[in-house]
Swiss-Prot record:
UniProt KW keywords: Biotin biosynthesis, Cytoplasm, Hydrolase, Serine esterase
All copies of domain AB hydrolase-1, residue ranges: 16-240
Name of this chain's protein: Pimeloyl-[acyl-carrier protein] methyl ester esterase
Protein family (similarity comment): Belongs to the AB hydrolase superfamily. Carboxylesterase BioH family.
Catalytic function, reaction form: 6-carboxyhexanoyl-[ACP] methyl ester + H2O = 6-carboxyhexanoyl-[ACP] + methanol + H(+)
Pathway connected to this protein: Cofactor biosynthesis; biotin biosynthesis
Organism: Serratia proteamaculans (strain 568)
Subunit: Monomer.
Encoding gene per record: bioH
GO biological process: biotin biosynthetic process
Length: 264
């Protein structure tokens, strides 16, 4: 049986869908709940094949976006972290009329490094795919450790991420490989350049997976969007700097919500 895990909580009147990253599940947002629920109606989703959304086969980015969108409210703000940022971006491209605004966190429209583009070396992503079949759990743990590297609370944050994975059903090797394949091959740089809805990109200064150079490059090629780099954060800024992160989200939605209402 395939069923998408979807939990809705919060006292606010604005819908905000939160999409997690590779290998994880919606529990990764636990530290943000008390900060966001007074202001938003939060939609916590386990992406297809991850956490409690079991029974799905590996799929393309477009297929994943379609499945998530089918369960979503008619209109919402969308926030995607890492791989979730690609899914949220694809949703904004597919059905922009259903997206009030898009927030990507430690994400890139093109995760794989290219000659003119900073990112993860393709052979590193391919290596992770190979290692999954050799030592599943250790490979996932290595990837999680990379996400917090360099922060003041790196060990504590890595333990939190590990507990998020272990406390819910584990994704299969097929699902994890499929996610890495999306990270290795997706390139939404040109597609998103034409997006006209509010777009905020949040980065961690210490992020070893999405280099901060990406922020400057997209500032130039996507002038309609804005970016913020959180100084002491790595790949999971909402875990290492939750108060600053929540303030950034609240400000962006408040400012752009007013702009959207005035434009309608």
């Amino acid at each position: 049986m395939t069923a998408l895990y979807w939990q809705t909580i919060g006292e606010g009147d604005r819908d905000l869908v939160l999409l997690h990253g590779w290998g994880l599940n919606a529990e990764v947002w636990s530290c943000m709940l008390e900060r966001l629920t007074p202001h938003f109606r939060l939609h916590l989703v386990d992406l297809p094949g991850y956490g409690r959304s079991q029974g799905f086969a590996a799929m393309s980015l477009e297929q994943m976006a379609e499945i998530v969108l089918d369960a979503a409210p008619a209109q919402a703000w969308w926030l995607g972290w890492s791989l979730g940022g690609l899914v949220a971006s694809q949703i904004a491209l597919t059905q922009p009329q259903r997206v009030h605004g898009l927030i990507t966190v430690a994400s890139s429209p093109c995760f794989a490094a290219q000659d003119d583009w900073p990112g993860i070396r393709p052979e590193v992503l391919s290596g992770f795919q190979h290692q999954l079949s050799q030592d599943f759990q250790r490979t996932v743990e290595r990837f999680l450790a990379l996400q917090t590297l360099g922060t003041e609370s790196a060990r504590q944050d890595a333990r939190l991420l590990k507990s998020v994975v272990l406390n819910q059903p584990m994704p299969s090797v097929e699902i994890l490989n499929g996610g890495l394949e999306i990270l290795r091959t997706a390139d939404l740089r040109q597609s998103l350049a034409g997006l006209s809805l509010p777009l905020l990109r949040i980065y961690g200064y210490l992020d070893g997976l999405v280099p901060r150079k990406v922020a400057g490059l997209l500032d130039v090629s996507w002038p309609h969007s804005s970016s913020i780099i959180i100084a002491k954060a790595a790949h999971a800024p909402f875990i290492s700097q939750p108060d600053e992160f929540a303030e950034i989200i609240g400000t962006f939605v408040a400012e752009n919500g007013i702009c959207r209402q005035n434009a309608q």
